[in-house]
Amino acid sequence: MNKTILITGAAKRIGKEIALTFSDLGWNIIIHYNSSKDDAEKLANQINSNNPNTAKIVQANLDY
């Protein structure tokens, strides 16, 4: 069974490391970003190069 996780702020810093860790554990990753699209795309490409079709990006402004 595949598991999927949505990681907010995953394009940089701690969120990025969390995404990489879950990817190493075999999870599908949804990478959230607000304005760091290039960083999110780079991370998705990095994850997908090791585990094809397991990472996707989504943009959302989560300010409340």
What spans do the regions from the language model cover?
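Aromatic pocket-lining residues of Rossmann-like dinucleotide-binding sites
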Residues: 22
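Rossmann-fold cofactor-recognition segment
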Residues: 50-64
